[in-house]
């Protein structure tokens, strides 16, 4: 890494912590329902909504009722998104006259946006009408993010509660998160994006002449309400682009400043939730330990991917091409990257979007060096707990914290405890389910895709790189990331259905056992700290937590990674 990359990383982390701390205080207030008096008019509107829907906001839910409400809410959301896509040809706000989307693609997209994955097998500018973008995809960008944060709130309440049968009210949580967190942040961020040149309109596509004049063919420029969707796309760690090029498109991400702000937006709520966690459990040091573990793993990932991309292709270096960055060139591997961002900003964006469950891209991960592309892939496969998605990153890391204290308990022969709650067989069974669901979906799905006749047909490249494209797709879907090695032609009935299954169970097959853990912990008494209690706020626990995350990730995925990016790297090195 050069000095520019180090400075960029340092400024990014400093601004992130500066912004996440006050947001954490606000998130804690929203979780507890302690809203300031100045919001009384909004609170009255909120109360009216509950009354109209027949919801008693004062009644808490057990984990089973919470889970059923969540599943029903998201299932209805998926049906609505599916129907809007199928019917868009006869609906308004469709100036290009785009027809209804096919059944398999509609199903894939509905599951994708409801599960906060935002995998896109289609090109937005040639497939989706403005109404579908706004009413189907845009709405789910808010609701899927609110669902993830609600689950995180429920798990935090499980740790903080004392002999309680309730973990909150799902309908209240989703409403408050949407109204008091996601909407205000998105509104402010959308205005900023418009100031940077992100478009926001409902005009028909524009035909323009290029600089060549009459000798050239007119070019069609896609229009649309981009800024409003771009804001929640980042803040909600959704990642689904309005355009096919996602955040590499100048209408989505026009300037280096907008690029930096989008990176901050991705991590803002995940980092804020860690601070909120410390406040809600009554010990800010607990949140600090989780934050330290996340930051260490994130910095290691950024340094690795940036260094590998800056080094460039070894065969080009052998031909005398200068790979060193200078005032006149970016150096390194610029394939698939935007000149206005360069290697450092592209590598940092790649690490951020895959550490979080965002999946937005400002460069093509498929064009990264073999080991450079392995870094974002591994970040996805670790379960996206390095800050992670909104809500999902925190509850995923808390599951690993439970695993870490269990391992420590085995080493010292003591019943494990975390935040005063005994970790017993039921919690460990649910923890095992959470940890094993996504690797099972990713690896089994990859095996199915490789052995089915229609699976390898979608590979854009032969050999280990084509295999990595499939592994990346299934890992991304199962872990609800949504980014891709885009050389894979995935908009086929086979991949649309396979990836939809991975996305649905990768999301809700994790959420349900997490809520079960929350319900079990909430019912327990909170034990006092004794001399035999493992401190979970110091550097020793941070190291133990990092070890648990890396150990599980490596044991699950290293054999699969060895067949893809590692083999490709060795083949590339041997060809010098």
Curated annotation (Swiss-Prot):
Indicate where this protein resides in the cell: Cell inner membrane
**Does Transmembrane helix count among this protein's keywords?**
yes
Instruction: Report membrane topology.
Output: Multi-pass membrane protein
Which spans are transmembrane here? 4-24, 65-85, 136-156, 179-199, 257-277, 288-308, 341-361, 371-391, 393-413, 430-450, 497-517, 540-560
- InterPro entries named among the record's database cross-references: KdpA
What are the UniProt keywords, alphabetically?
Cell inner membrane, Cell membrane, Ion transport, Membrane, Potassium, Potassium transport, Transmembrane, Transmembrane helix, Transport
**GO MF term set:** P-type potassium transmembrane transporter activity; potassium ion binding
Which Pfam families does the annotation name?
KdpA
Gene Ontology cellular component annotations, sorted alphabetically: plasma membrane
Primary localisation category? membrane
Note whether Cell inner membrane occurs among the keywords.
Answer: yes
Q: Any idea what job this protein has?
A: Part of the high-affinity ATP-driven potassium transport (or Kdp) system, which catalyzes the hydrolysis of ATP coupled with the electrogenic transport of potassium into the cytoplasm. This subunit binds the periplasmic potassium ions and delivers the ions to the membrane domain of KdpB through an intramembrane tunnel.
Q: How does it assemble?
A: The system is composed of three essential subunits: KdpA, KdpB and KdpC.
Membership in a protein family: Belongs to the KdpA family.
**Name this polypeptide is given:** Potassium-transporting ATPase potassium-binding subunit
Q: Which organism is it from?
A: Methylibium petroleiphilum (strain ATCC BAA-1232 / LMG 22953 / PM1)
The opening ranks of the lineage are:
Bacteria, Pseudomonadati, Pseudomonadota, Betaproteobacteria, Burkholderiales
